[in-house]
């Protein structure tokens, strides 16, 4: 699958998309989440306002220096059509005309202009130039060109020289990056503070800091966008003895509906006006009055591990790149987003990452590539990279990492936005991702990810015109001498098989005679050929010598057969000796004599005399086969010798022989004893896992190989499906002499190898690309190539993953009928680790590095190790090679794990393309036509990849849930009240001192009583120790040094001691103390209660001492969400108890304004006390207030109105009817 998303409709097609934008805005805004920007286009035609047209001549323009010029599409006012115009930016004026040679140019003054993108997704790369007199909607060919124009227009505004900069100028100038959008709730302009126009609040929003503005106000907005460097912070920087610290960066207004103040935990924000503040980094929200009370140092929020703080970018290198201070960055994250991926969803993710992180660490791959970002991070010892895109985007970044040699410094994660996303599936990040609101959770998972190594492979190519392979059907007898050689090979293989396996004496004698004649003719033909083609007498003599040895071995075989014909037949009971002889012969011919003597000692002499004859025949047959091999090897050396020039090139291809003998077919299907009684092949690496249930008699033992992952055998030479096995055996018929002679011993891929003397040598090759996922040649590459071509021609048809998969299905179905590469085995030759692989009839070959192919298919057919192959893995330096028979197989493999098409597991792959025409090839979804020549796949390096660790995430989540259940709600809420080193006011210090004295008195009385009552010590020891430890933290000699964090800890512990002591003395089963001790403890307990009640008058301590009194108390975590009436009774009784304690002094009818204000405090609505006091609302008036009265008082929030009405209703129930 292609890695990057498709290019979207060209600007010429944008008119249709923009025409319906006005109708789409309202519906989209209604469906958008609260507080979120709509993703629909804001394409607007120029307003009907009158303007004075200013023109200039080409001569006047020529005198000015051009900053940027080129063709753009301009939207006209008539039906929003697009017309091509030529634009020139010179000075602070933009000129445009029909073409560059026009004499008259329209001009637009940019003195008070602002620039904004046209929409959230911005599929057509359009942008708007907004001036006080007009709006100009323009459209670029691609996103990079659009951003270049926007940057140049902004540089005019700041009077800075425009450059195709290393970084966008707005990232370092504080300028906002506008785009047009609509909103689902009332939104206010941060410039004029008025609401944005329209039902859906049309306006401009900064893509980084979400600063809102009218289109007319954007030009007056201050350059206070999100900070990127230390210089951009300015006077807000915090300096202390440890150096500089990161301050909060506050943005006013437009808070979400659920906003709560981090200081007082009350709701903040408003839909009626621009009020309250939000930090752009830690996302903390506070009231205007509480902002100064909040800790000034910003903790950077949920994503702090991934963020590079602006204070860390404090200097510049000589080459213009920012230098980071490493002490501020533990494991920073570098983000690359392909803005074209996922139907232009990448634009949305690009903006969201800039809002979460430092904008200087987020880069668009479509605007400059990955080089700039990697240069910024290259001096970090360790950093992480997140690539948001498809497999092509990942490959692009990995290739740039290779160029800068950063493999050891960085780990790379993937967020799947492309079509196939095979690598993301394997790494555990899924096959697709569309929800940009969940990015904080993704960053959190990325911080917990583990690292694995990914093998990367170089695709080396060497273009060379090679003669086409021979035809499938042999030519007429007089066509070539190769035809006669094929006849000899068939005859020798057939008659050797009959001699060794036949039980009929007449058949053996007849085959021996025919074999004798065939070998003699073969020797004569070889000698005749070499006499004609070779001028080197030494070489000719060597070949002649080998031929004489062949004749000698043939005579010895015939002599053994003649002797055997006079002996008695072998008894059936001696057949195991022949099988054992086969096992002995698999070792070496030299050891055959010793084994023969050893076997002879284990049996009786008569039996030995009868068994020697078959063993001798087998020995002679092997000797004859060895002699034939030596003739062929000698001929091969001659053909490889550069000093020898034969008349015709050697044909090393394996031809399809339709006249295969019945005997050879029988041998190809047989897995039994016939296959084991054979001759030896050329040396080959042993493979213990490759056994197929019989002796490996076809290999000579090599050096011992350690059973480790690094020393795995280089080739697995077995397959499973008998059908493919038979096809391979058939394909060998008509091949080289060695293959013919070994046909009786064939295993599926056990033909004689053409060993590459140096498998890793790539001299003369050029690196075409690097493979991370998979390589394909033939059918699948042709489908990928056609899809890529169609996407380039009609990008509007390939905008989503679903459409892309449908197109792949259509193209695959077409190939099911066309079968364009049904004879691919005739055009290519496959070698694995230097071993020549004879191919069956197929349409394609796939080489897999990861167990995911073409959008999630496990094309290898399994993930576990079996008796034949090792488990596939992307970190074992081993490739999996599979055959592609047709497109139906590719479709079926998506739902069924097929295994019959496996070919081999190896460390290098070599594919030779014959003929004059190229063959389609694809790597990781990127396809091209490869000219004839050689393709070599060799290991390049390994990359560190971040894989999702679901087991660790599950364990950590269970632990966090347990901590939440154990700690309870008050402890969970304490993080909102960490005020660090803020000193207390004088009144607050005195109140804390009184409370501490009361707590010390209570501890003293408890200790005195515990000397007599041991149970009291057991029950209260923990609370007493915790309270004493908190009180000791406060310095009694210097009470003014108390800080809020110390006061908070004291208050919490004193409250806990009070609760436990009270429950022990006046609980359901009270502890009976002696009279004096009980009285003293009760008096001390009452004093603590009084002091705690005074502490609740301090606003920031009230919600710590009375956390959420209107909610149910903490219970079992599994039942917290249970809203049944059984659990609502408890808080209701609790509220009535508190209410009676504080209002029982007098009836509601006699309440004054102070009692009403206290009642509002009980409802957590103290912000309305001033309104009630100002309108002199007393108890009698309070009982008769209705909804419309509350609205007239200026209470805007519906939830607050409902809470007040519910409280009034409860007051009415508790008040006697006579009083009302």
Curated annotation (Swiss-Prot):
GO terms for molecular function: ATP binding; ATP-dependent diacylglycerol kinase activity; identical protein binding; kinase binding; SAM domain binding; zinc ion binding. Coiled coil: none annotated. It is found in: Cytoplasm; Cell membrane. Residues 593-604 have a biased composition (Basic and acidic residues). It comes from the Eukaryota. Keywords: ATP-binding, Cell membrane, Cytoplasm, Kinase, Lipid metabolism, Membrane, Metal-binding, Nucleotide-binding, Phosphoprotein, Repeat, Transferase, Zinc, Zinc-finger. Residues 20-35 have a biased composition (Low complexity). The keyword Zinc applies. Residues 1151-1214 form the SAM domain. SMART domains: C1, DAGKa, DAGKc, PH, SAM. One of its GO terms (biological process) is phospholipase C-activating G protein-coupled receptor signaling pathway. Its EC number is 2.7.1.107. Residues 65-158 form the PH domain. Residues 1-60, 581-617, 636-705 are annotated as: Disordered. Phosphorylated. Phosphorylation does not inhibit catalytic activity. A motif (PDZ-binding) lies at residues 1218-1220. Residues 328-463 form the DAGKc domain. A zinc finger (Phorbol-ester/DAG-type) spans 175-225, 247-298. InterPro entries: ATP-NAD_kinase_N, C1-like_sf, C1_DGKeta_rpt2, DGK, DGKD_4H, Diacylglycerol_kin_accessory, Diacylglycerol_kinase_cat_dom, NAD/diacylglycerol_kinase_sf. Its main location: cytoplasm. Belongs to the eukaryotic diacylglycerol kinase family. Diacylglycerol kinase that converts diacylglycerol/DAG into phosphatidic acid/phosphatidate/PA and regulates the respective levels of these two bioactive lipids. Thereby, acts as a central switch between the signaling pathways activated by these second messengers with different cellular targets and opposite effects in numerous biological processes. Plays a key role in promoting cell growth. Activates the Ras/B-Raf/C-Raf/MEK/ERK signaling pathway induced by EGF. Regulates the recruitment of RAF1 and BRAF from cytoplasm to membranes and their heterodimerization. Interacts with RAF1 and BRAF. This is Diacylglycerol kinase eta. It comes from Homo sapiens. The lineage of its organism: Eukaryota, Metazoa, Chordata, Craniata, Vertebrata.
């Amino acid at each position: 699958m292609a890695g990057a998303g498709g290019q979207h409709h060209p600007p010429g097609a944008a008119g249709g998309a923009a025409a319906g934008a006005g109708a789409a805005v309202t519906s989209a805004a209604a469906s958008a989440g609260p507080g979120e920007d709509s993703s629909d286009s804001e394409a607007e035609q120029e307003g009907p306002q009158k303007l004075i047209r200013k023109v200039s001549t080409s001569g006047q323009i020529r005198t000015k220096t051009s900053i940027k010029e080129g063709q753009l599409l301009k939207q006209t006012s008539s039906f929003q059509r697009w017309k091509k115009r030529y634009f020139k930016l010179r000075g602070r004026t933009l000129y445009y005309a029909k073409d560059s040679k026009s004499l008259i140019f329209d001009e637009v003054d940019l003195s008070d202009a602002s620039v904004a993108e046209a929409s959230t997704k911005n599929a057509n790369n359009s942008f708007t130039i907004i001036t006080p007199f007009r709006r100009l909607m323009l459209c670029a060919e691609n996103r990079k060109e659009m951003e270049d124009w926007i940057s140049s227009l902004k540089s005019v505004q700041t009077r800075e020289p425009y450059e195709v900069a290393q970084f966008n100028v707005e990232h370092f100038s504080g300028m906002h990056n506008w785009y047009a959008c609509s909103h689902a709730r009332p939104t206010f302009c941060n410039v004029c503070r008025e609401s944005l126009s329209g039902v859906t609040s049309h306006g401009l929003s900064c893509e980084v800091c979400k600063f809102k503005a009218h289109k007319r106000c954007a030009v007056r907005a201050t350059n206070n966008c999100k900070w990127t460097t230390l210089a951009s912070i300015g006077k807000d920087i915090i300096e202390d003895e440890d150096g500089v610290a990161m301050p909060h960066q506050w943005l006013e207004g437009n808070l979400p509906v659920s906003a709560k103040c981090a200081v007082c935990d009350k709701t903040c924000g408003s839909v009626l006006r621009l009020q309250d503040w939000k930090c752009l980094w830690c996302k903390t929200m506070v009231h205007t009055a509480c902002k100064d009370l909040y800790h000034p140092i910003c903790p950077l929020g949920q994503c702090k591990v991934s963020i590079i703080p602006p204070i860390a970018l404090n200097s510049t290198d000589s080459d213009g790149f920012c230098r980071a201070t490493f002490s501020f960055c533990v494991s920073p994250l570098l983000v690359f987003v392909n803005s074209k991926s996922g139907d232009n969803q990448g634009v949305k993710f690009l903006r969201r990452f800039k809002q979460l992180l430092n904008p200087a660490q987020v880069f668009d791959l479509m605007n400059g590539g990955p080089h700039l970002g990697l240069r910024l991070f290259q001096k970090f010892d360790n950093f992480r990279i997140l690539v948001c895109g498809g497999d092509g985007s990942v490959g692009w970044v990995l290739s740039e990492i290779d160029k800068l040699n950063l493999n050891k410094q960085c780990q790379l994660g993937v967020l799947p936005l492309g079509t196939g996303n095979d690598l993301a599936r394997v790494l555990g990040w899924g096959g697709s991702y569309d929800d940009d609101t969940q990015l904080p959770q993704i960053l959190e998972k990325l911080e917990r990810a583990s690292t694995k190594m990914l093998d990367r492979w170089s695709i080396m190519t060497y273009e060379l015109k090679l003669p086409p392979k021979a035809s499938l059907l042999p030519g007429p007898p007089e066509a070539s001498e190769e035809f006669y050689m094929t006849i000899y090979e068939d005859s020798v293989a057939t008659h050797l098989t009959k001699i060794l396996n036949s039980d009929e004496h007449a058949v053996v004698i007849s085959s021996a005679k025919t074999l004798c004649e065939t070998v003699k003719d073969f020797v004569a033909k070889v000698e005749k050929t070499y006499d004609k083609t070779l001028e080197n007498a030494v070489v000719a003599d060597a070949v002649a010598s080998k031929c004489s040895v062949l004749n000698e071995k043939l005579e010895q075989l015939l002599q053994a057969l003649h002797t055997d014909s006079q002996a008695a037949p072998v008894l059936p009971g001696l057949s195991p000796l022949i099988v054992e002889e086969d096992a002995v012969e698999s070792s070496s011919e030299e050891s055959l004599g010793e084994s023969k003597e050893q076997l002879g000692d284990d049996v009786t002499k008569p039996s030995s005399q009868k068994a020697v004859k078959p063993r001798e025949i087998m020995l002679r047959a092997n000797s004859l086969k060895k002699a034939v091999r030596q003739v062929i090897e000698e001929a091969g050396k001659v053909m490889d010798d550069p000093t020898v020039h034969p008349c015709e090139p050697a044909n090393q291809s394996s031809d399809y022989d339709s006249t295969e003998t019945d005997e050879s077919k029988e041998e190809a299907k047989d897995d039994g004893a016939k296959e084991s009684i054979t001759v030896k092949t050329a040396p080959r690496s042993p493979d213990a896992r490759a056994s197929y249930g019989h002796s490996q008699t076809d290999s000579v033992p090599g050096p011992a190989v350690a059973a480790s992952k690094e020393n795995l055998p280089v080739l697995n030479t077995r397959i499973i499906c008998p059908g493919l096995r038979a096809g391979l055996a058939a394909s060998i018929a008509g091949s080289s002499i060695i293959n013919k002679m070994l046909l009786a011993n064939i295993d599926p891929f056990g033909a004689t190898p053409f060993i590459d003397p140096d498998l890793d040598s790539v001299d003369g090759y050029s690196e075409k690309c690097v493979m991370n996922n998979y390589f394909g040649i033939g059918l699948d590459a042709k489908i990928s190539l056609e899809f890529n071509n169609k996407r380039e021609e009609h990008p509007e048809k390939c905008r989503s993953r679903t459409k892309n998969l449908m197109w792949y299905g259509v193209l695959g179905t077409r190939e099911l009928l066309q079968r364009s590469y049904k004879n691919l085995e005739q055009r290519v030759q496959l070698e694995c680790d230097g071993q020549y692989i004879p191919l069956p009839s197929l349409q394609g070959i796939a080489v897999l590095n990861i167990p995911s192919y073409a959008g999630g298919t496990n094309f290898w057919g399994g993930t576990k190790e079996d008796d034949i192959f090792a488990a596939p893995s992307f970190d074992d330096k081993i490739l999996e090679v599979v055959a592609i028979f047709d497109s139906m197989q590719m479709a079926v493999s998506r739902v069924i794990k097929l295994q019959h098409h496996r070919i081999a597991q190896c460390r290098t792959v070599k594919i030779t393309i014959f003929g004059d025409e190229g063959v389609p090839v694809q790597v990781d979804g990127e396809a091209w036509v490869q000219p004839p020549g050689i393709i070599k796949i060799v290991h390049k390096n390994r990359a560190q990849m971040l894989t999702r660790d679901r087991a660790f995430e599950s364990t950590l989540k269970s632990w966090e849930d347990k901590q939440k259940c154990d700690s309870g709600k008050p402890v969970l809420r304490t993080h909102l009240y960490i005020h660090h080193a803020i000193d207390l006011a004088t009144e607050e210090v005195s109140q804390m001192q009184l409370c501490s004295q009361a707590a010390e008195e209570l501890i003293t009385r408890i200790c005195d009583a515990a000397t007599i009552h041991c149970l009291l010590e057991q029950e209260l020891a923990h609370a007493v120790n915790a309270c004493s430890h908190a009180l000791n933290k406060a310095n009694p000699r210097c009470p003014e040094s108390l800080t809020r964090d110390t006061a908070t800890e004291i208050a919490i512990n004193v409250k806990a001691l009070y609760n436990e002591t009270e429950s022990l003395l006046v609980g359901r089963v009270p502890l009976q103390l002696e009279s004096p001790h009980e009285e003293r403890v009760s008096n001390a307990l009452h004093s603590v209660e009084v002091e705690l009640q005074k502490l609740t008058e301090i606003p920031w301590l009230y919600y710590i001492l009375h956390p959420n009194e209107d909610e149910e108390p903490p219970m079992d975590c599994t039942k917290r969400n249970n809203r049944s009436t059984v659990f609502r009774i408890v808080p209701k009784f609790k509220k009535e108890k508190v209410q009676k304690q504080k209002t029982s002094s007098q009836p509601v009818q006699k309440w004054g304004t102070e009692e009403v204000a206290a009642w509002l405090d009980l409802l957590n609505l103290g912000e309305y006390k001033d309104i009630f006091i100002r309108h002199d609302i007393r108890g009698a008036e309070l009982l008769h207030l209705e909804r419309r009265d509350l609205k007239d008082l200026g209470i805007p929030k519906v939830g607050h109105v409902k809470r007040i009405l519910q409280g009034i209703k409860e007051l009415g129930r508790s008040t006697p009817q006579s009083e009302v």
